[in-house]
């Protein structure tokens, strides 16, 4: 058997009908009694022979002897030799000062004893006794140490719970059982919720399909609509008729009403009392209530006098609200070049307007009028502001002259 990477030989010892693992060097009925505990606390280095119920209480016996004065016994070796079992004054620093069951060694020994672990040619045979007394042999050919470390504590097996491949049913703590029950509940509830959601969605689709096949709008008679509504009597209405009824409180008309057209019979014989025209886009009335055309009515409304007859035109003048391509070309010809951009006058326009531009042509300043500018209103970069000299600072105590860089040329702005 491999223990801590070193080979250790064990044999099967029996005592009072039980079986446990014990070292080959010493196997007695007192030392391998199942479920036995060391009742008295022993010093860190055991000075008297004691019973060791489990092989894990010992360290592997090496051939090298190390003699130091670290312990209380001068000249005593600290390694576990083969004569440690039953030999007095050999230290065993693997034997703690408290009870062994505090560290779980005896619990593990009891589990292996109750499970009936036998070692034979690197094969670990585990006989697990079920609640009904049936012995189920479980041969395991894996590493013995890894197998023994997986053995659980000896807990009475519930008859109602079967043996599972992962472990003994019911052999768990309260937290483990609660977590297992919660996990099993989750595993069973998840498919149920999924199935119920799927049934609900499929059932809802089927119900809506079957329930809407025989529906008909009582107003317009359609059978398909994004949303069915009801009128005041509870009858089904399509979405359009339902919304119309909700907003207007009466049934939606089946025929779309035509736009109101002016009756030509009514307007026959009407003429403007001012310019005597019979054609206009809109008839108006003057201050005396007589009908006038749109042009005469607007002129009287703005100027409070009648529109002169000389302003009458043959056709009706309309307003071009959108600039057509022809009009834009005409404006380009009138300007004598490309259209100017807003806020950025060109050289030709600036010369005609009397504005002097710097070399970069980015910013212009009028020579005739001073430029009113305050630092609070115009935030220029701090690198463009500087004083000419110290005398300027003394002379202009409140606000010295400001030098502003406009596109490469320095402009002296006197703010006083």
Curated annotation (Swiss-Prot):
GO CC annotations on file: axon; nucleus; perikaryon
InterPro entries: Transcription_factor_GATA, Znf_GATA, Znf_NHR/GATA
Broad class of where this protein is predominantly found: nucleus
Region (Disordered): 156-211, 319-351
Positions of disulphide bridges: none
Tissue: Expressed in ventral cord and retrovesicular ganglion neurons. Expressed in vulval muscles of hermaphrodites and lateral seam and tail seam cells of males. Expressed in spermatozoa within the spermatheca of hermaphrodites.
Keywords annotated in UniProt: Activator, Cell projection, Developmental protein, DNA-binding, Metal-binding, Nucleus, Repeat, Transcription, Transcription regulation, Zinc, Zinc-finger
Compositional bias annotation for Polar residues: 191-211
Compartments where located: Nucleus; Perikaryon; Cell projection, Axon
Protein name: Transcription factor elt-1
Organism of this sequence: Caenorhabditis elegans
Source lineage: Eukaryota, Metazoa, Ecdysozoa, Nematoda, Chromadorea
């Amino acid at each position: 058997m491999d223990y801590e990477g070193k080979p250790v030989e064990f044999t099967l010892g029996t005592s009072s009908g039980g079986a446990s693992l014990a070292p080959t060097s010493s196997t007695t009925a007192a030392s391998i009694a199942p479920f036995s505990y060391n009742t008295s606390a022993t010093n860190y280095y055991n000075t008297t022979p004691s019973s060791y119920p489990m092989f894990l209480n010992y360290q592997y016996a090496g051939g090298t002897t190390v003699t130091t004065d670290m312990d209380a016994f001068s000249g005593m070796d600290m390694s576990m030799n083969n004569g440690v079992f039953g030999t007095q004054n050999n230290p065993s620093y693997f034997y703690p000062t408290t009870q062994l069951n505090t560290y779980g060694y005896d619990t593990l020994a009891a589990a292996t004893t109750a499970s009936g672990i036998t070692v034979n040619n690197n094969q670990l045979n585990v006989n697990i006794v079920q609640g009904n007394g049936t012995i189920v042999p479980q041969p395991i050919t894996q590493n013995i140490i890894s197998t023994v470390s997986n053995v659980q504590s000896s807990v009475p097996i519930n008859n109602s719970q079967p043996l599972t491949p992962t472990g003994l049913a019911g052999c768990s703590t309260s937290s483990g059982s609660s977590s297992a029950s919660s996990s099993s509940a989750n595993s069973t509830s998840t498919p149920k919720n999924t199935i119920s959601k799927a049934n609900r969605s499929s059932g809802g689709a089927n119900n809506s399909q079957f329930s809407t096949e025989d529906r008909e709008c009582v107003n317009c008679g359609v059978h398909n609509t994004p949303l069915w509504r009801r009128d005041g009597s509870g009858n089904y209405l399509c979405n359009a008729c339902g919304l119309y009824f909700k907003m207007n409180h009466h049934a939606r008309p089946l025929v779309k009403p035509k736009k109101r057209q002016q009756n030509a019979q009514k307007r026959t014989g009407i003429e403007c009392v001012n310019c005597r025209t019979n054609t206009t886009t809109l008839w108006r009335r003057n201050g005396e209530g007589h009908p006038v055309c749109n042009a005469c009515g607007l002129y009287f409304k703005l100027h409070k006098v009648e529109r002169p007859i000389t302003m009458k035109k043959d056709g009706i003048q309309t307003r071009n609200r959108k600039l057509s391509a022809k009009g834009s070309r005409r404006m380009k010809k009138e300007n004598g070049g490309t259209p100017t951009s807003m806020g950025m006058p060109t050289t030709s326009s600036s010369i005609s307007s009397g504005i002097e531009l710097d070399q970069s042509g980015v910013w212009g300043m009028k020579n005739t009028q001073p430029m009113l500018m305050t630092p609070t209103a115009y935030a220029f970069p701090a690198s463009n502001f500087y004083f000419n000299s110290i005398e300027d600072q003394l002379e202009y105590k409140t606000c010295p002259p400001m030098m502003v860089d406009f596109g490469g040329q320095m402009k002296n702005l006197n703010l006083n």
